[in-house]
From Swiss-Prot:
Region (Disordered): 34-71
Gene (name only): rpsU
GO MF assignments: structural constituent of ribosome
Keyword Ribosomal protein: yes
UniProt keyword terms in alphabetical order: Ribonucleoprotein, Ribosomal protein
Protein name in the entry: Small ribosomal subunit protein bS21
Comp. bias (Basic residues): 45-59
Alphabetized PANTHER family for the sequence: MITOCHONDRIAL 28S RIBOSOMAL PROTEIN S21 (PTHR21109), SMALL RIBOSOMAL SUBUNIT PROTEIN BS21 (PTHR21109:SF22)
Entry-linked InterPro entries: Ribosomal_bS21, Ribosomal_bS21_CS, Ribosomal_bS21_sf
Length: 71
């Protein structure tokens, strides 16, 4: 859990914003959402593999688009 120390004369809103940002960087909310329901190991592998395929296809399409514009 991220810890944020409130500095002297620092408004509460600023400290809260820093805390939210540190939670986002640490991935606390995504971890909570991921652990909310049990996911079987096979479905987890399947989901991760599908995400990797999607990332790879997106990267290839970006590279191809970049090459076609360089004439």
């Amino acid at each position: 859990m991220p810890v944020v120390k409130v500095k002297e004369n620092e408004p509460f809103d600023v400290a809260l914003r820093r805390f939210k940002r540190s939670c986002e960087k640490a991935g606390v909310l995504s971890e909570v959402r991921r652990r909310e329901h049990y996911e079987k190991p096979t479905s987890e592998r399947k989901r991760k593999k599908a995400a990797a395929v999607k990332r790879h296809a997106k990267k290839l399409s970006r590279d191809n688009a970049r090459r076609t514009r360089l004439y």
